[in-house]
Structure formats: structure tokens, C-alpha cells
Amino acid sequence: MGVISIVGILAISALNIITNIYELLKVSLATSEIKDLQKNISGVYNYSGDYEQLFLGDVYKTLCETDKVAPNQMCVKKDSSYVLKHRLSGSVVLGKSDDSKGYTITFGNLSKKNCVKLSQIEWLDRKKISIYQIDINETEVAHFPKKANKEFPITATTSSVACNKKENSITWYFY
């Protein structure tokens, strides 16, 4: 009987380890998705100095089909258009910044743990990234002047306090 108990405990421990590794992989893939989406949108639409042309017509069909800017795994066909989903099974919403010189990307349906991890993404890439604000659950948690930001220092404590719902959302602001 003791051997069976030990084997059971070891099996449960192994299952927990595998589950944690799988969750870390999904967060890593979601991190890649937001970075790839941002990089692709900025690369295609930044030439005119604003992102107004991105929002002409059906933005999701443009991102997934016409310009093929969104990573394929994020594009989910819905009727005659598309919706975007991230690897953590939540929605992805694109929006205009207040002045149309930038855009926002919102990841929805995030657990507290995943919200905290994604809010602390390191945005330094090729010496410059054009992120200037982050909101968690529609509340601004960080804002920087519109200049090249080399890092985005949101502490784990700030993230943990802000990611206080069962389902959280993060909105990143880019220009």
C-alpha cells in the first residue's frame, strides 16, 4: 500500500511539473505574439507617420488576409471576416490612439498570473521600441513621454495589484 501511495504522489508531482511547463510555454508564445503583431503593424503602417490607414474598413480582415500582418495562429475566421485570439485563449483587440498617430493592442481574458507576466514584457528590441503606455483593466499603470523607451519598468508588485480580477486585460499603446 505504501508503494502505491508513493507512486501516486510522484505521478501527481510529475503532472504538476508538466502543467507548469505547459503554462510557461503558452505565456512565452503569447509574448511572441504581441511582439510580432506590434513589430509587423509598425513595419507596414508606420511609413505615413500615423496609423489612420490601418483602421479604414475591416481592420481584422486587413491584418489577417489583405496585408497578412497578424501571425497566422492569431487569425480566426468568423463569417466573412476574422477575429484575433492569443495563445492564452483570449481576445485580441486593436484600437486607435486618441490622436490617430498610434494604436493600441489589448489582450483580454488573462488570468492574474498571466496578466502579471505579460505586463512585465521587456520591450527593448534593436535599441528602440515605440511603446508609451500600458493599461491593466482599463487603468493606466505606466506612461512614458513619446520617445524611444529602452525599458518598461513595471514592478511585479504594481502588476500584481493591477491584475486583480479573475479575467484581466492589458492594453499596450504604441506609436
Question: Which residues make up each language-model segment?
Answer:
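Long, contiguous hydrophobic alpha-helical segments, chiefly transmembrane helices and signal peptides
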Residues: 1-2, 37, 118
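Periplasmic/extracellular, small/polar-rich flexible segments of pilin-like filament-forming proteins
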Residues: 47-175
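N-terminal single-pass transmembrane signal-anchor helix
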Residues: 1-26, 30-33
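N-terminal alpha-helical signal peptides/signal-anchor transmembrane segments
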Residues: 21, 30-52
